Amino acid sequence: MKIALLEPIGVSKEVIDELSAPITEKGHEFVYYDTKTTDPAELAKRSEGCDIVMIANNPYPTEVVEKADALKMLSVAFTGIDHIGTDKCKEKNIMICNAAGYSNQTVAELIIGMAIDALRHVVKADGLVRNGGTSAGLGGKEICGRTVGIIGLGQIGLMAAKLFQAFGAKVIAYNRSESEEAKALGIEYKSLEEVLSTSDIVSLNLPLNAETRGFLSADKIALMNENTIFINCARGPIVDNLSLIHI
């Protein structure tokens, strides 16, 4: 069996060798590419004769899947799979394995970190001090007492909600279904319009798919207060980013 990792994944060659040793010891061929490419022709070349291809967030479009005649499984070291030609994979009976949930806590904590930075001007103050200035005039605010709106109350959204509550925030949420666990935590479900218009901090946590692409359109973005902190730790195309820039 031929297995190929088509892109670097942020670890050393020594780690790759250690992790791939059990594969090669069983007689399988393992190939590692330490450069990233989005060129379909190069991706197709790297995939030639492969039974299993591994990627992270590198695009693997339909035209590449089409040419991968030996491919049986596509292993994705990433949560989302919107960068893959999934329809063609289904058509060719190619199994897709992704790493759903591998970084839920990490992303939830990142959301909190971004909120703290936006409220307390951490990065800006750091830059000023490093250049001989002071943080004078950068009055900060607290999460405590703020209303936080979570759009998409899945695993990441719920984890972030719990963390915000630990800071003393009131959490409201918009989700297409309601969770008894969330209700037990005191999270209030609201309409999307109410979440956007009444929240001091809005955290977007939806997956990217055909239904959510462009979900946060210009008219919805306009519902937010000019002082609202908007955090998108989901995927960029869920938001009309041009409208976000200009509003």
Model-based region annotation:
Residues 1-50, 172:
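N-terminal glycine-/charge-rich "phosphate-binding" loop or analogous flexible N-terminal tail
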Residues 49-126, 246:
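Phosphate/diphosphate ligand-binding glycine-rich loop within oxidoreductases
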Residues 157-158:
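N-terminal Rossmann-fold NAD(P) dinucleotide-binding loop
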Residues 92-94, 99-147, 162, 166, ...:
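Phosphate-binding beta-alpha-beta segment of Rossmann-like dinucleotide-binding domains, i.e.
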Residues 13, 17, 37-43, 58-62, ...:
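Structural motif corresponding to alpha-helix initiation and N-cap regions
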Residues 62-65, 177-245:
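Rossmann-like adenosine-cofactor binding region
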Residues 4, 73-75, 95-97, 172, ...:
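Structural detector of well-ordered beta-strand residues that form the stable sheet scaffold
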Residues 153-154:
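Glycine-rich Rossmann-fold phosphate-binding loop(s) that bind the pyrophosphate
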